[in-house]
């Protein structure tokens, strides 16, 4: 049975093709960060306040857990947390209706304790969060209705967080978003696009930290001070195929970069998101492509210039940002 909610609809800007998902129920999300304190649904002992687990990392104690993935109660895509079949969509749509925004939208609850920062999560448990995400992405890679998937985090009110309890979100889309199309197109003209990114960062002293064969670097054109990317040195298109050493490295580096940012700008809000290639059932694996995690501090708001031109302004150069992050 489908959801009783109207399904989300996807509209496109007629001049640029930019997609916009209309999901009115998103306005119903709890807003604990605005001061309306509620019983936290993500804390241990409150599991009945969330949908059932999709996946879970168990704790050593019987019945306990360290991290869990559940359906998002206020999804951007897939109104009931699942992809709807073509027959359902055709039968329900009135003439001229915008296409439904199919997909899956889930919440990754990263700790049973009520903590606000990933820095409060023990390193082994934090690595387990990334392993849980890898497992779920591997499941979605086998679903031919999901073209592409990501994990993203909103940390702090300025980054769009609505609940304090540490968590991230996992989304699978039935289409490939424009930013990934643009990255694939830009990389198609280079024999080794990500290798060039790493080499340039080494030459220009923009490497912040390394672990295993992963590097954390400040990109040459950061959108905000201290923007950092984490990526492997050698090609790997899909995060769910990464080996255990790389998984441990991305966990260690993500905590390291957030810790460095927090020491430079205490309690700084930030977003991050995982970029990987579209799943192979949707498009052939791109040659010499690298999944990468982009960490974007939210230190300056976007104003008319940025929104009207698509250009960003930063107050710290890439090289200076890397030096400050290394020094903390």
PLM region descriptions:
Residues 240, 244-253:
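Gly/Ser/Thr-rich active-site loops/lids in small-molecule metabolic enzymes
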């Amino acid at each position: 049975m489908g959801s009783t909610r109207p399904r989300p609809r996807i509209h496109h800007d007629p001049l640029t093709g930019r997609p916009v998902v209309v999901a009115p129920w998103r306005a119903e999300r709890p807003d604990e960060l605005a001061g309306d304190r509620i019983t936290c649904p993500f804390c241990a002992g409150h599991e009945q306040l969330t949908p059932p687990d999709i996946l879970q990392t168990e704790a050593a104690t019987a019945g306990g857990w360290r991290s869990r993935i559940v359906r998002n109660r206020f999804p951007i895509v897939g109104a009931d947390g699942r992809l709807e079949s073509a027959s359902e969509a055709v039968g329900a749509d009135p003439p001229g209706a915008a296409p439904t925004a199919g997909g899956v939208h889930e919440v990754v609850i990263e700790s049973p304790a009520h903590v606000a920062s990933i820095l409060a999560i023990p390193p082994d448990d934090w690595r387990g969060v990334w392993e849980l995400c890898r497992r779920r992405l591997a499941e979605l890679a086998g679903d031919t209705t999901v073209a592409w998937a990501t994990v993203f985090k909103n940390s702090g009110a300025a980054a769009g967080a609505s609940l304090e309890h540490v968590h991230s979100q996992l989304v699978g889309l039935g289409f490939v978003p424009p930013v990934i199309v643009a990255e694939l197109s830009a990389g198609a003209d280079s024999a080794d696009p990500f290798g060039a990114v790493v080499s340039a960062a080494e030459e220009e002293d923009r490497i912040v930290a390394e672990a295993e064969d992963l590097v954390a670097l400040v990109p040459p054109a950061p959108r905000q001070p201290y923007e950092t990317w984490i990526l492997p040195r050698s090609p790997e298109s899909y995060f769910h195929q990464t080996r255990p050493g790389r998984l441990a490295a991305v966990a260690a580096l993500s905590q390291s970069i957030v810790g460095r940012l927090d020491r430079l700008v205490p309690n700084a809000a930030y977003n991050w998101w995982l970029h990987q290639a579209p799943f192979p059932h949707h498009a052939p694996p791109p040659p010499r492509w690298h999944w990468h995690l982009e960490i974007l501090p939210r230190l300056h708001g976007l104003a008319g210039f940025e929104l009207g031109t698509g250009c960003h302004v930063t107050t710290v150069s890439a090289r200076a940002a890397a030096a400050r992050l290394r020094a903390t």
